[in-house]
Structures are given as structure tokens and as C-alpha cells.
């Protein structure tokens, strides 16, 4: 019996699993975007006695995409700060990092843990590696972040999505800035339809989840557990 004959059923099962995760992923994303369209009061989250957290959503996401995570962490006593200047996070990484740094300084936040999704992790690393205010950051927990870029980026229709090419100047600079990696926790699924290269980051604490997806992994209990580990 050939090797292909032995392993082909496994490949079909893996494909079926990945397609199921993909469908569940977009259902989660659609539900989150509908929720994010409603009113929100970020200032209500900014109080608490414990270590401060700053939310960094992904591209085309507002802070409310991360609201369930923010509410859970705020309930544990952490002030959760929102960078409203990011909007839906379509600006270049360097510009967005400047806005995050400005918030850290304006609110005099120190010993901060960044909580990031996707592009937000690149913005957070840009702050940590290149902004003077990066010294105010204790750690970052980044979920489904394309630290090595995504090969799909070059096929995208907008400059904001094509910015994730591995050959992009900002992406190359971030890749070369390995000194801050030890302060980063990279959490990612077993399958990510947006990042075929994966989100493993050399020198970081890498946490591979059993489930898959790019969006729905935000609801995995390990995400909150890793933020708590970094912040408490």
C-alpha cells in the first residue's frame, strides 16, 4: 500500500476540520462586528487597582471587537485603556504606534501590558522596539499576529492589507528587532486562514491553541489566562 493511500484520509479529515474552523471563524467575526457597531463607553473600563492594560485591535476592528476580553479583565480589577485614535485601525503601523505611545505618555501609564489582536500585535511591537514610550510596556500578549507577515497580503486590494507582506520595510524592521521578543507572548491557533506562515515568534513565549481560526481564538480561555499570567 502506498504512503499516499495511508495518509490521504488524514489529509481529508484535516481539510474538513480546517473548513469547519474557517466557517466558525467568520461567524464569530460577523457577530463581533455587529456588537461593535453599538454604543460603547471605553472610559468605564479605565479604572481599577491592578496593572493597566491597553487594547490594540486588529485591522478593520475597533476596540469593541475586543470588548468581551476587556470586560473580563476589567472585572479582575485591571484598568483597561482604549486608544480611540486608532479608529478602525487602517493607518500605517508606524503612525498607529505613535498614537499608542502618545496615550501612554498622556495618561502617564507605566508597567503596562498590551493586549493585541492581529495587526495590533505589530503596532505593539513597534511601540516596544522603536518608541521611547516602549519603556513603559512590561509585556504584550498578541493573539493571531502575523509577525512574519502573510503571503496572502500581496493579493489584497488595499494598501493597508498589503502592508503585511514580509518584504515590507516596516515588517522587515520589526522582524529585525528581536530584543523585545522576550517580553511578548504570542498566542495562535492550530490553523489560521489569514496567516498560513503562523504566528510563532522566535524568543517569545509561544502558545499554540488546540482550536483554529483568526478571530474566534480570542474567545479561547487560554487567551485570558495568558494575559493574567503576564499582568498578575
Residue ranges and their predicted role:
Residues 42-43, 129, 177, 199, ...:
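Hydrophobic alpha-helical segments, principally membrane-spanning helices and signal/leader peptides
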Residues 180-232:
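C-terminal catalytic-base region of ester-bond hydrolases, centering on the histidine
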Residues 1-54, 60-82, 106-109, 231:
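Flexible, membrane-associating and regulatory peripheral segments of lipid-active enzymes
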Residues 53-64, 68, 72-182, 194-195:
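Serine-dependent carboxylesterase/thioesterase catalytic core
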Residues 26, 65, 92, 152, ...:
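Short, function-defining helix-loop hinge/capping sites that tune catalysis or transport
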Amino acid at each position: 500500500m502506498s504512503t499516499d493511500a495511508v495518509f490521504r484520509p488524514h489529509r481529508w479529515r484535516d481539510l474538513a476540520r480546517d473548513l469547519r474552523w474557517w466557517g466558525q471563524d467568520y461567524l464569530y467575526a460577523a457577530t463581533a462586528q455587529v456588537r461593535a457597531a453599538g454604543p460603547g463607553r471605553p472610559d468605564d473600563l479605565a479604572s481599577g487597582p491592578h496593572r493597566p492594560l491597553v487594547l490594540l485591535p486588529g485591522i478593520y476592528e475597533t476596540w469593541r471587537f475586543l470588548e468581551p476580553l476587556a470586560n473580563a479583565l476589567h472585572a479582575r480589577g485591571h484598568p483597561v485603556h482604549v486608544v480611540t485614535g486608532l479608529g478602525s485601525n487602517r493607518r500605517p503601523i508606524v503612525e498607529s504606534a505613535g498614537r499608542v505611545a502618545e496615550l501612554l505618555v498622556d495618561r502617564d501609564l507605566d508597567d503596562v501590558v498590551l493586549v493585541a489582536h492581529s495587526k495590533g500585535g505589530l503596532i505593539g511591537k513597534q511601540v516596544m522596539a522603536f518608541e521611547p514610550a516602549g519603556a513603559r510596556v512590561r509585556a504584550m500578549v498578541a493573539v493571531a499576529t502575523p509577525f512574519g507577515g502573510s503571503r496572502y497580503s500581496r493579493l489584497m486590494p488595499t494598501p493597508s492589507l498589503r502592508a503585511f507582506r514580509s518584504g515590507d520595510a516596516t515588517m522587515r524592521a520589526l522582524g529585525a528587532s528581536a530584543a523585545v521578543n522576550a517580553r511578548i507572548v504570542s498566542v495562535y491557533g492550530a490553523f489560521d486562514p489569514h496567516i498560513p506562515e503562523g504566528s510563532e515568534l522566535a524568543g517569545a513565549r509561544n502558545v499554540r491553541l488546540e482550536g483554529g481560526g483568526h478571530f474566534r481564538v480570542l474567545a479561547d480561555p487560554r487567551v485570558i489566562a495568558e494575559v493574567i499570567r503576564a499582568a498578575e
